[in-house]
From Swiss-Prot:
Negative results: does not show activity on all potassium channel tested (Kv1.1/KCNA1, Kv1.2/KCNA2, Kv1.3/KCNA3, Kv1.4/KCNA4, Kv1.5/KCNA5, Kv1.6/KCNA8, Shaker IR, and Kv11.1/KCNH2/ERG1). A synonymy between H.magnifica and R.crispa is controversial. Serine protease inhibitor that also shows protective effect in a cytotoxicity model. It binds to all proteases tested (trypsin (Ki=52 nM), alpha-chymotrypsin, cathepsin G, kallikrein, and human neutrophil elastase). It significantly increases neuroblastoma cell viability in an in vitro neurotoxicity model, being a consequence of an effective decrease of reactive oxygen species (ROS) level in the cells. It also seems to protect cells by inhibiting ATP-induced purinoceptor (P2RX7) activation. It comes from Radianthus crispa (Leathery sea anemone). GO terms for molecular function: ion channel regulator activity; serine-type endopeptidase inhibitor activity; toxin activity. Belongs to the venom Kunitz-type family. Sea anemone type 2 potassium channel toxin subfamily. The gene is iq2c1. The record marks 43-44 as: Reactive bond for trypsin. This is PI-stichotoxin-Hcr2i. The lineage of its organism: Eukaryota, Metazoa, Cnidaria, Anthozoa, Hexacorallia.
Length: 85
């Protein structure tokens, strides 16, 4: 029981630190929150979020899967965390 708990705790910590590292990397790339929404040039259908600088809110959109820019977040939480919405 303790072993299972420890393994779960290690996995959760690993995912957490990996996501923090990703957030930090996006921040140092420049002000991605002011970039326009870009759906990309491919025909995929991936639900994503972008920061709309006119409304000051994270807004859902459908990403095509390639191209695009940094203002493209997999979750609403990630968009809000990076762009402080």
């Amino acid at each position: 029981m303790k072993g299972t708990f420890l393994i779960c705790l290690i996995l959760i910590a690993g995912f957490y630190f990996r996501s923090i590292q990703g957030f930090y990397f996006k921040r140092i790339q420049g002000n991605i929150c002011s970039e326009p929404k870009k759906v990309g040039r491919c025909r995929g259908s991936f639900p994503r979020f972008y920061f709309d600088s006119e409304t000051g809110k994270c807004t859902p959109f459908i990403y095509g899967g390639c191209g695009g820019n940094g203002n493209n977040f997999e979750t609403l939480h990630a968009c809000r965390a990076i762009c402080r919405a």
